Amino acid sequence: MPQVTMRQMLEAGVHFGHQTRYWNPKMAPYIFGARGKIHIINLEKTVPLFNDAMNFLSSVAQKRGTVLFLGTKRSARESIKEEAERCNMPFMTQRWLGGTLTNFRTVKQSVARLKELEAAETDGTFDKLVKHEVLGLRREREKLDASLGGIKEMNRLPDAIFVIDIGHEDIAIKEAKKLGIPVIAVVDTNYDPALVDYAIPGNDDAIRAVQLYARAAADAVLEGKAAAPNSASVREEEFSADAADEGKGRRAPAKKGDKKADAAE
């Protein structure tokens, strides 16, 4: 599991919450106090919850699951994209499209269209078209890539979602909850931590804090992948288990003179 210390969190500004007038009372257990009308988050509470969240991400990856990285606010986009690509997981950094999860079949059709346009641009198809047609198709491709490029290799619904700022991504969280997809999220002092499965009390605005969260999430995924059994060992274990079961069900041949065998005959 990626080790992030309280000092690293302090240096990244994880402990700075929102203005006190915007607080959500349900965050009270995680608030240390206030300084200059800004709530200060109790990092002694954050660290264990952070570790629980990272352990869960690692377990998902170890089971070969998919984690969708989500951060569409300006301060999160770069870090989310960079770290998701580093651990080879899907991501969304532009506006969340309603129905991305609950209407995934339609989204897959749009992704197929994106791949079709990308192929047409590289295989020479565009060269056979007139200029204004090419411009129109390129604009369509760019628009699709901006919104769906990060999930074009996500062939099924994700097994978990890692989120920065639950207020900004409220539609996505509602869709995930409806489908029973676990949500791991950074929750600032102005939101309800009960809205997600794994809440990480912390600053969801500071770029350095977001970088810390995203980097740790990617590290957790990579550690989980590294611990996952490879296909060969899985097949070997399954073969051994099948052989053992078969051996248990097979009756050993009776020896001559075996009283129990003679009685049975």
UniProtKB/Swiss-Prot annotation:
**CDD domains noted in UniProt:** RPS2
Spell out where the chain crosses the membrane.
none
Tell me the domain of life: Bacteria
- Record field: compositional bias (Basic and acidic residues): 245-265
Region listing for Disordered, in residue ranges:
226-265
The disulfide bridges present are: none
GO cellular component annotations of the record: cytosolic small ribosomal subunit
Cite the entry's keywords alphabetically.
Answer: Ribonucleoprotein, Ribosomal protein
* Keyword Ribonucleoprotein in record: yes
Q: Which Gene3D superfamilies match?
A: Glucose-6-phosphate isomerase like protein, domain 1 (3.40.50.10490), Helix hairpin bin (1.10.287.610)
Whether Protein transport counts among this entry's keywords is no
One Gene Ontology term from the biological process aspect of the record? translation
Q: Which GO terms describe its molecular function?
A: structural constituent of ribosome
Q: Which family does it belong to?
A: Belongs to the universal ribosomal protein uS2 family.
In terms of NCBIfam families, this protein maps to:
rpsB_bact
Annotated PANTHER family = 30S RIBOSOMAL PROTEIN S2 PROKARYOTIC AND ORGANELLAR, SMALL RIBOSOMAL SUBUNIT PROTEIN US2M
Under what name is this protein listed? Small ribosomal subunit protein uS2
Q: Which gene encodes it?
A: rpsB
